[in-house]
Swiss-Prot record:
The modification Phosphothreonine is found at residue 72. It comes from Homo sapiens (Human). Widely expressed with the highest expression in heart, liver, placenta and peripheral blood leukocytes. This is Akirin-1. Keywords: Nucleus, Phosphoprotein. It is found in: Nucleus. The gene is AKIRIN1. 'Akiraka ni suru' means 'making things clear' in Japanese. The name is given based on the presence of the clear nuclear localization signal.
Amino acid sequence: MACGATLKRPMEFEAALLSPGSPKRRRCAPLPGPTPGLRPPDAEPPPPFQTQTPPQSLQQPAPPGSERRLPTPEQIFQNIKQEYSRYQRWRHLEVVLNQSEACASESQPHSSALTAPSSPGSSWMKKDQPTFTLRQVGIICERLLKDYEDKIREEYEQILNTKLAEQYESFVKFTHDQIMRRYGTRPTSYVS
């Protein structure tokens, strides 16, 4: 099969090559105005939970020639903290929606279906302290990975032993069939 690639000519050459009566179409010029992804500074901020803006350190591009810096432990901690709080809000909304669906399916109104933010059940949202340190999270992840690896290793050994037993049985059956074919129904003797 043949494969080809074409390149669009740069804009500065188009004016020289294309005359007004040319049958070729001209390139579309971009419209003046703001780009679709950017909004003017006086515009209102986007509603929460729809778009998330990255931290200031990630928004600004690094100047050319400078090294890309890795995030500091504090930045990692802040990112994990933000993700955890988002996860908690998401779980809380999921619980509230499940409770409201259960109440709607029962056709009985419950006043406790939707908990108010001031109720004691949602006090965990007020506390924004981490449950685990970064080191503890690393240790937990290592332990989970080790357990998962051990489980996979056991399953692999079990499957391998099963296949080996099947292969041995087929070998014994094949050998028995070959012996029966060769010697038939003759009585076996110790002298050959």
